[in-house]
Structures are given as C-alpha cells and as structure tokens.
Amino acid sequence: MALALDTLRLADYLTGVLGEPVEVVGLRSLGGEAIEDPKGFGYGVPFEVECRLASGPRSLVVSRTRPASGFGHDYPADRAWQALYGHAAYNDFPRHARSLDVGFVRTDGEMVSAADAVDFFQLVEKVEGRLYWLDLQRLMQASPTPLDTERARALAGFLATVHADKRDEPALYARRVRELVGHGECVMGILDSLPHPWPPLRPELCEALETAFVRWRWRLRERAGRLSRTHGDFHPWNILFREGTDFGVLDRSRGEWGEPADDVAALGINYLFFGMRRAAARGERGVAEPFLTLFHTFLATYVERSHDRELFDTLPPFLAFRALVLAHPRWYPDLAPTVRDGLIHLATRLAASARFEPGDVAWLCGAVR
C-alpha cells in the first residue's frame, strides 16, 4: 500500500516523536526538481516536511522504499526491513544523516512509531492436529494403511489447487529463482553454514554445486509463466492432520508467489528421506517401502490434478536444495552416514541434471543400479 501523507496525521506523529507541538507548513516530494538528474531511478521515495515548532523551524524527510518490481522490494515485509535497517544503520555511520524514528502507517492512515522495537513477533491461531512427520515416523516400523495413501493424495491435490492461482510477473518469478540460489536460507546460505572443512562436502564440491545452481537459475528464468501461489516451506513439520484427510498448515514463508516445484519438492523429498532412513536401518541403501510408493503416489497425483507436464523440467534444483538441507549436520546431526551420503548424491546428481526422471529416484538416493 502506498504511503499517503496527511498533514494532520503527520503533525500528530511528529509531535509524539519530537516531544513538542508540531505544525506542518509544507510538504513536497524530493527529487522532483527541473534540474536534469542522470540518475533516472532510485529505491527511495522521499518527502521533505517543513515544520514549525516552538523551538524554531525544522526541515525533516520522510522516506519509504519504492515497491518496484524486480529489486527484492515486492512485499511490505521487504520494505519494512529497509526502514528498520536504515534506522539502525544510519546512526552508526560517521557524517550520515541521522535517523530520528522508524514507523508504519495503519490502514486508517495513522502513523505509528516503531523506533523502540527490539524484536518482532507474530500472533497466530493455534492449529489443532498431529504433525504429519509423526505419520511418517510411524511408518518406519509399521505397515501402511489406506489412510496413508489417501493423505499423500490429499496433500498433492491441495497443492495442485493452490498452484492453479497464477500471476503474470516475470520479475517476481526471477526473484524467487534467484533466492533459491543466493538467499541465506537457501543454497548458498546452507553451504556457507556447513562446518568447513567438512569431508562430505569439501569446498571444491560446494563450488561445483553453486555453479550448477546458477546454471539452473538462468534456465528457469524463461519459465516465468509458471509463477503461482505457493506455500514456500511445505514439509511434514508444517502440516497437521486431524481426522481422515482434514489438515491445516503452518509457517508459510519465502514469499507468496513462486515456482510450484518448490512446494512439491519440500514434501516429496521427505518421503525419500524417511525411506532412506528406513533402508539404512536395515543395512541397505536407497529408498525403502512404503515411502518409495508414497513418493510416487504423491507425485503422480499432483501431475494428474495440476496437468503440470513441465514439473519434471523444473523439479531438480528444488529437490537438490531440500536434499542439502536434510544432509546438513546442524539440522540433522544423527543421520546414518549412508543416509547423509545418499542425500548428497541426490543433490549433486540433480543439480547437474537437465530433468527429473521419477524412475531414477532410488538410484539417485544411493541404491545400486
């Protein structure tokens, strides 16, 4: 939502910040001078505010981040970060213009200070249910029931419905693919956070992985028509089942729009993960049942419901990223070496591939061909 500056609201806000009555006598956009400026675009949208106070006249600037597409400022949360960062960073640098406050605008136009905030929280409803990973953990020992298959199908159908909501914004799709590679929570962040030197993924192997992911970034940019509504972290620790196939979800993240393969990979990799753990417990490699069948059921149902025949062309880097997360010793410190090796094998093979072939999944996860 654009920042609308109402002079009365602004005066009330400034009175609270400055500690004395403020009258706003002038308000104008900066950067609108007739002088020809070689800089044709900037991230900021600054307004000069001329004020009259008992202590004397004062000039201030109210600035916001422009919601321009393509520069990582697409969502209000992106722009909030810029303001919060600026308030702290400006005042810790010599000769810099001082930041007096950082605030936000309510839906009714009221301007509210947030300068004394030291941390942020979110208040959400409690979702009743049992986390889906507990279903998968049960299957490490028990035989599957028809409900296990029904739940895999229900999750696939849900994603197909969610992903049917499309958006035409190539720059936003490019951003999501870029974040897959370079975001602190994604490939480069995961690789940077390994306890180097770490024998399973030596620095030269990490470099090769990053190079392969960058190639995927440029390959996927041409598929911007796939931009869809997504969850962003659709894994079994964020899904709670109630009775039957009724479920709720938690912790949507990494943007509201993205590549459908991201959600498919986030859940699909966990069928493989639990299957690899079960195989390792038996002294085997690959993906044990019933997890291999659940993986194929989930994937086939998604393709059937979504009619997404391009999925297998976009799935490899997202599955590879999720495999790297699962292989990380910080997140999963107690994995059997064969499972960790299998996940790294999966990630490296998929990152270097051109397409995901479902029939190869057991081999990709370490089974002997």
What are these regions (language model features)?
Residues E150, R175, H307-L319:
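All-alpha amphipathic helical-bundle segments outside canonical DNA-binding/catalytic cores
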Residues E36-P57, V61-V62, V162, V214-V264:
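Active-site acidic catalytic loop and adjacent metal/ATP-binding pocket
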Residues M1-I35:
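Juxta-kinase regulatory segment immediately upstream of eukaryotic protein kinase catalytic domains
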Residues D341-R369:
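Charge-rich, low-complexity intrinsically disordered segments
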Residues A34-I35, G44-V45, E50-G182:
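Conserved ATP-binding subdomain of kinase catalytic cores across diverse folds
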Residues R66-A68, F121, E125-P144, A164-R167, ...:
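A glycine-centered beta->alpha junction motif in the catalytic cores
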Residues A261-S306, A320-T338:
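Active-site activation/catalytic loop segments of kinase-like enzymes and analogous catalytic loops
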Residues M1, F120, E125-V127, L172-R219, ...:
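Active-site catalytic-loop/activation-segment of kinase and kinase-like phosphoryl-transfer enzymes
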